[in-house]
């Protein structure tokens, strides 16, 4: 018998602001087998979880994610545009999301957002963080950029 997995796209994004900690926690609480999330780099090279290259659609900020440090990104509200109820939600770091899922068997699909903007070193940083939390057996890495996946595979080989 095959086991079909329920992966919550950007967390429980139908009911909560996408790619936020509350959306990820609710996906876990609601019985999802895993989540899909999107990763980009901030100006100070922090791995941040946000789908769009710009802040405009999902936050009260404007401009490109890459043009802000993580501390600056924390000033933007990632929940209010979804609903006033979620005012105050922040753009999370990938590390904070991984910490949430270390002590369970949740599956993570990490999409490398490296096609419109080329974030040099994104793949290596993501792999090292996955390895730090011993999540190699529970992570799927995806990207629309086939070269990004190739680089990720090469990073894995250099560590093994």
Q: Language model features by range: what are they?
A:
Residues 1-160:
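Phosphate-group recognition and catalysis centered on beta-loop-alpha active-site segments
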């Amino acid at each position: 018998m095959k086991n079909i997995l329920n992966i919550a796209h950007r967390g429980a994004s139908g009911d909560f602001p996408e790619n936020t900690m509350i959306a990820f926690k609710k996906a876990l609480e609601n019985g999802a087998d895993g989540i899909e999330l999107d990763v980009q780099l901030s100006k100070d090279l922090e791995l941040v979880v946000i789908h769009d290259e710009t802040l405009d659609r999902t936050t009260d900020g404007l401009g490109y994610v890459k043009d802000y440090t993580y501390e600056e990104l924390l000033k933007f509200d990632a929940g209010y545009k979804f609903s006033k109820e979620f005012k105050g939600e922040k753009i999370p770091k990938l590390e904070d999301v991984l910490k949430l899922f270390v002590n369970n068997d949740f599956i993570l699909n990490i999409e490398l957002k490296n096609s419109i903007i080329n974030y040099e070193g994104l793949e290596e940083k993501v792999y090292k963080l996955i390895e730090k939390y011993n999540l190699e057996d529970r992570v799927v890495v995806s990207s629309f950029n086939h070269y990004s996946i190739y680089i990720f595979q090469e990073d894995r080989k250099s560590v093994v």
